[in-house]
Amino acid sequence: MAGLNSLEAVKRKIQALQQQADDAEDRAQGLQRELDGERERREKAEGDAAALNRRIQLLEEELDRAQEQLATALQNLEEAEKAADESERGMKVIENRAMKDEEKMEILEMQLKEAKHITDEADRKYEEVARKLVILEGELKRAEERAEVSELKCGDLEEELKNVTNNLKSLEAASEKYSEKEDKYEEEIKLLSDKLKEAETRAEFAERTVSKLEKTIDDLEEKLAQAKEENVGLHQTLDQTLNELNCI
């Protein structure tokens, strides 16, 4: 009777050990699956981090190109402003010359008025009219010649002033164009800088995620090793119990 009770106890112990072994095996398989899942997530996170790094590199290259274009546009704008300043100085010189010609014209008009006044006075004195008329005709002729020369000069000055004005308008249009390009490039650089900062933030987050996943995997690997050791111990105990049973 005592032998049967001992045998039953051994069987129950075997069953309990077998159940522990099965449970340990299930835990080990579960930990292995969890470890595989964590490895897959780590590989995916590493792939995302690599893609973000490539994206950051592309954004940096695009930012460099935009900065080079902006530098070129600023240089062209500076040259256009210098040309506009030179044209403005030239226009002031022409305006001064035109003012001098206008002064000469006023003097000629005064001389002409004086000649007319003398002519009016000559009407009252016939003899003086005849003598003074010859003088006045000569003076009037010379005055008309000077007036014609002044008119020709004024025409040339007006044409030159028109050309300078047209050139100045062209330079102003070019300056506005370069200013618009400069604003556009600055806006593009701002957008690229924002994208670069966002990509860097995402890359830092991905790197922290990879570190956490690596820590989780290390912990799971340690737990798996412990479970395997427990499983080996249970199998050894089970084998020892079976040997004892066979001896009985």
Swiss-Prot record:
Single GO molecular function: identical protein binding
Region of interest (Disordered), ranges: 18-49, 78-97
Assigned keywords, A-Z: Acetylation, Actin-binding, Calcium, Coiled coil, Cytoplasm, Cytoskeleton, Metal-binding, Muscle protein, Phosphoprotein
Chief location of this protein within or outside the cell: cytoplasm
UniProt-listed GO biological process terms: platelet formation
Signal peptide: none
Modified residues (Phosphothreonine): T216
GO cellular component: actin cytoskeleton; cortical cytoskeleton; cytoplasm; podosome; stress fiber
Pfam families to which the protein is assigned, alphabetical: Tropomyosin
Physiological role: Binds to actin filaments in muscle and non-muscle cells. Plays a central role, in association with the troponin complex, in the calcium dependent regulation of vertebrate striated muscle contraction. Smooth muscle contraction is regulated by interaction with caldesmon. In non-muscle cells is implicated in stabilizing cytoskeleton actin filaments. Binds calcium. Plays a role in platelet biogenesis.
Domain note: The molecule is in a coiled coil structure that is formed by 2 polypeptide chains. The sequence exhibits a prominent seven-residues periodicity.
Protein name stated in the entry: Tropomyosin alpha-4 chain
UniProt organism field: Mus musculus (Mouse)
